[in-house]
Amino acid sequence: MSLYDVTVNIQLQKVVKRLDFGIPLIMTAGVTASPAQEGQEQQTPVTHAYAEYTSIQQVKEVFGDSDIISVIAASIFKQENAPKRIACCTTTATNLNALKAVKDQNWRQLILTSLDWDGESKDLTDVFDWCEENKRVLFTSTKSTTKFTDFSAKKGTYHHIVVLYYNDTTEQVVFPEAAVVGATAGKKVGSITYKNQILAGVLPMVLEESELKTYHDAGCITIVSKAGDIVTSEGKALSGQYLDITDSMDWLEQQLRYKVQKVLNNNDKVEYTDRGINLLEGAAISVLKEAYDNGMIAEDPDGLPMYWAKFAKREETEAADRV
């Protein structure tokens, strides 16, 4: 037997994968039955529970070719960098109750076909507030900004609400926000801005610069033509904050919580020692590094990433906390 002064200890570690950031959801709430024909009983509303789909063919098999869900799904899947999966759901519940029912599902971007800009302002603000509180990004479109005065006092807080001004007099395009979702949801978080995203299957608005400024000042974005491409005019949410910043902040919070929790799950015991603290710190740093690699974190003048994780060593903590 050979003798060695070196001992090699190899341990197989579990790789903590990234948690999915969520997929687009197309939802119709308040579904009602078709009017009963003379001599026939009233029909039961046809609804479809939350489910995920990987192609427009799968969506059409469930909803049919002409249903608005299928039309929106087709626009999403038509984009060059479309997401690999989307979710669809129809329900008799109200908009707000419908959202509450799918809160724990794996979705992030929302197209709510039953959101009525001509209806009660409270319905809009209830949906906006819920999406903001639960960090889900609502994409919606309107032909007018007059309704904005009803929630102007809170407009600056809506970092997760994207309003598209779109007045297509030909009515060839319905739910133009679907193209925006399809063009962006399949890309890495932090790797894009939402401005100048190339869109397929939609018509551009023809606006004077002063008109465009008016809509941007109101918190809207729209669809325009630039250098021969049809693109988004701006990349901000209703609050005026860039949507990629909101995405990055939400992603960091989600991934930090997830990866630190996985450390606790994958170890029978994470001791309150420097070693245990280092395990948690390592998980946090791995998230921050990925965020930097994806363009979410800037560099300092020396070209170094501007992030750090400060976990107090055991000796730096209060004695009472170590009991």
Segments from the language model and where they lie:
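Surface-exposed assembly/interface segments
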Residues: M1-V323
